[in-house]
């Protein structure tokens, strides 16, 4: 089976910034993404868990998308415009997809 090169971009950001981020991604031409809850973690500020959050807007989410390599810079520019002033981590991973026309 033939596979095609792609980039998997994972953006972990404060839940309150989720709609701003997804809007920026859509404006950058990203047509698909998945939003996952983040239940806890550890970073420069220490450990944290989502279980103690009182409001729905608190905590973190991870937005994951796969795109063609030539679209990466445009996506990263859009994501960084949202993430740079907030808590967030952006990772980029090389991956292979089976149906390139979907990305």
Regions found by a protein language model. Give the residues of each.
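Positively charged, small/polar-rich N-terminal and surface patches that mediate targeting and assembly
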Residues: 1-103
């Amino acid at each position: 089976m033939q596979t095609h090169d792609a980039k998997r971009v994972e953006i972990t950001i404060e839940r309150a910034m989720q709609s701003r981020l997804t809007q920026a991604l859509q404006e950058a031409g990203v047509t698909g993404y998945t939003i996952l809850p983040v239940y806890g973690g550890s970073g420069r500020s220490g450990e944290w868990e989502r279980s103690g959050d009182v409001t729905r807007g608190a905590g973190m989410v991870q937005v994951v998308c796969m795109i063609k390599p030539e679209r990466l810079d445009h996506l990263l520019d859009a994501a960084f415009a949202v993430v740079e002033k907030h808590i967030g981590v952006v990772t980029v991973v090389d991956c292979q997809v089976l149906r390139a026309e979907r990305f």
